Amino acid sequence: MSTRYNARAAEPKWQKIWEERGDFLMRDDADGKPKYYVLEMFPYPSGRIHMGHVRNYTMGDVIARYKKARGFNVLHPMGWDAFGMPAENAAMEKNVHPKGWTYDNIAAMREQLKAIGLAIDWSREFATCDPEYYGHEQALFLDMLEAGLVSRKKSMVNWDPVDNTVLANEQVIDGRGWRSGALVERRELTQWFLKISDFADELLEGLDTLDRWPEKVRLMQKNWIGRSEGARVFFELENAPDGNTKLEIFTTRPDTLYGASFCALSPHHPLTQSLAKDNPALTDFIRECDRIGTSEEAIETADKMGFDTGLKARHPFIEGKTLPVYVANFVLMDYGTGAIFACPAHDQRDLDFARKYNLPVIPVVAPKDKQGAELDAFASGLAETGTDAYTGDGVAINSDFLNGLDVQSAKRAAIDRLEAKGIGEGTVNYRLRDWGISRQRYWGCPIPVIHCASCGTLPVPRDQLPVVLPDDVNFSEPGNPLDRHPSWKHVDCPKCGKPASRETDTFDTFVDSSWYFVRFTAPDAPTPTDKALADHWLPVDQYIGGIEHAILHLLYSRFFTRAMKATGHVSLDEPFAGLFTQGMVNHETYRDAEGRWVPPAEVDIETVSGKRVAKRIADGEPVIIGSVEKMSKSKKNTVDPEDIIAKYGADTARWFMLSDSPPERDVQWTDQGAEGAWRFTQRLWRMVTERQEDLAPTGTPMPTAFSEDELTLRRAAHQALAAATEDFENLRFNRAVARVYELANAVSGFTPGTPEGAFAKREALEILVQIVGPMMPHIAEECWEALGHGEPLTAAEWPVADKALLVEDSVTIAVQVNGKRRDELTIARDADRETVERAALALEKVGKAIDGKPVRKVIVVPGKIVNIVV
């Protein structure tokens, strides 16, 4: 047997064996086994996997293999999030059809993922661009339409001028499109919406049940849903255009109404738009606000800008007082009513605006400990020169009937007065807005509706689903090819039979990924779901993916599951019982003398006089070693998994990804780390294959007695097994790797001299291989076979640690003299006090420390410490 492990031969061999045996094909009726559903967020078929994929899917694979060995019926499927703009971009840039480009990429990536050795049930594979899949998605949409969960209305939208499509608020990052990076514009379009806001309370309350989700993700969703208790207040308007007699605002601080010094409208408030029709200067101001950006981040960092409309709003409590009405760039149309009253003394944005436009600052809340002259100084200082708004707790001042009340009491009293006067009411507001799902592009799921001039907007009859995308489209012009297709969009009205037209918008691709995990439970069902199977398999027990999806995909999926429950497709509320967000894969960056990025594969690094020096392999030109950053195509600091697999094997890549750092943290890919992982595979192989004569034959009964050395090895093996089992349960893969190293060292240091020792070494090696199995499955199978097993490791049950071997017979305790540590003592765990005392006093270093002085007393803390007082 070769002493060198050949990954290139072993890995395809075992992948073929697993496939032929059907080891990972999941059966719905698995003889009463408990179910376990593990799923990694499915990939976009870009054409090549990257190291982030390797890390993500390796983690899920470890769980799947471990749970299978533990006796679970494991569902571990794979599919493709296949619609989206990159395919259309490829069509325009490379003159290829999005469909062909996508399916070619899927074929390539499928082979790459198989090369990693994933325990995937490929029989359940689908792509979201399969008509079979998106036809069921269209049926779900029609179900939601019938249930009143869909609306169509005009709205201001985020328009990506590069991708020529609408973006949801969550897809606008720092004022730019999440995919194209283009500055987003605001336009009014008729859009389709899913009523996620109907589920705002449910989505918020459900977060409390997700105790296996990262707290950070739950907090991000909580903030995005944004439940706020406050008041609706109606300000009467003076000199307003016809029909605009009242201005409705929402505030969380009705207690500060006496501090109001102006009102402000969003640039996209209906009143603003009405005023702008006859005001070119206001129109220009709105355009400038749009140019700056629409996101909260962009608004937060931009200079505060305002436009005085000339309108006045009457104060609801102070007779005769009016407030100027501005249009302000920091007021969001998507929050509240798109209009605010501003209290500069107690809101920083309001204060910044007031100082810029010389508006009054009226303090109406003061700290409770401010009295008399100190209170006067606080109020006057804030009003006249203060640059920091006071946002703390306190009591109301300068507020008539509210004076002296704490903030919460003042809020309630203000709301009571508003309601009594009929000019306001207490209410709850949500930041969450309905989900705009219309996209003006070709490569997406067609929205199954028909527009008829006589009958209006109608659903496509269900017997005509799926509405399939046409293949004969032209990408030579910008915009949506479906709009200009000569025949596809022209249909007869299903109600009156007259000529009508199809909806040419397609779904936001996040719709596709909001229910795919349900379809995996019955991918061949003739309806969107097989409810019995969905109820059996869901929720997903462990979901794995990046934290960048905390709001978008994860929130949409939680909503979609509830909408599917409301339409009778599933019985649960929460789709993912456990969520794990893995860290990113990083690498050093490299630049040449001109500042151009250089890929790692083109760089050679040497250590010269203790310093790392880099040069380009092709021409020897010096290369600058830059910072360690997330692997990205833009900075060319990527490592191709195919190159790593070709050089070292998939197991090496998997091992390094699991071993280098905790899985929730970023990992830095280094050549040295990969080399170290590869060396361990060779060491493991040698440990198993060399000196097999030292091992007891397979199936040897356990001896009745062992020597102390043999027991020490057995304890090491069973303690490693118990610890690794707990590590796998808690997704602490790097710790499981550490257990493997510890046990490998224990096995390497043991040479058996008896049949009992031969048994102990075989037992330890088999446990070692079984712990390695979920993480490096190919070499584990080779080792298992070399150890004489006829069945593959995938068929073996997870070993059970012997509890008797998890407790050490001896214990090491510190020995102090007058509180200062002098030595340590290893002694039987059950030794009595007198035995411990005698052994401690007999230690040479302790004797020197006592130096003949009389011992006054000996304090023994069993199993921990001995303190000798002299």
From Swiss-Prot:
PROSITE patterns noted in UniProt: AA_TRNA_LIGASE_I
Organism: Parvibaculum lavamentivorans (strain DS-1 / DSM 13023 / NCIMB 13966)
Catalytic activity: tRNA(Leu) + L-leucine + ATP = L-leucyl-tRNA(Leu) + AMP + diphosphate
Enzyme class: ligase
GO cellular component: cytosol
Segments carrying motif 'KMSKS' region: 630-634
InterPro entries per the UniProt record, alphabetical: aa-tRNA-synth_I_CS, aa-tRNA-synth_Ia, Leu-tRNA-ligase, Leu_tRNA-synth_edit, M/V/L/I-tRNA-synth_anticd-bd, Methionyl/Leucyl_tRNA_Synth, Rossmann-like_a/b/a_fold, tRNAsynth_Ia_anticodon-bd
Family annotation (Gene3D superfamilies): 2.20.28.290, 3.10.20.590, HUPs, Isoleucyl-tRNA Synthetase, Domain 1, Valyl/Leucyl/Isoleucyl-tRNA synthetase, editing domain
CDD domains in the cross-refs: Anticodon_Ia_Leu_BEm, LeuRS_core
Pfam families: Anticodon_1, tRNA-synt_1, tRNA-synt_1_2, tRNA-synt_1g
GO biological process: leucyl-tRNA aminoacylation
Native organism taxonomy: Bacteria, Pseudomonadati, Pseudomonadota, Alphaproteobacteria, Hyphomicrobiales
Sequence motif 'HIGH' region, location on chain: 43-53
Homology family: Belongs to the class-I aminoacyl-tRNA synthetase family.
EC annotation from Swiss-Prot or TrEMBL: 6.1.1.4
Binding, ATP: K633
Main localization of the protein described in the UniProt heading: cytoplasm
Gene: leuS
Keywords assigned: Aminoacyl-tRNA synthetase, ATP-binding, Cytoplasm, Ligase, Nucleotide-binding, Protein biosynthesis
The protein's name in its UniProt record: Leucine--tRNA ligase
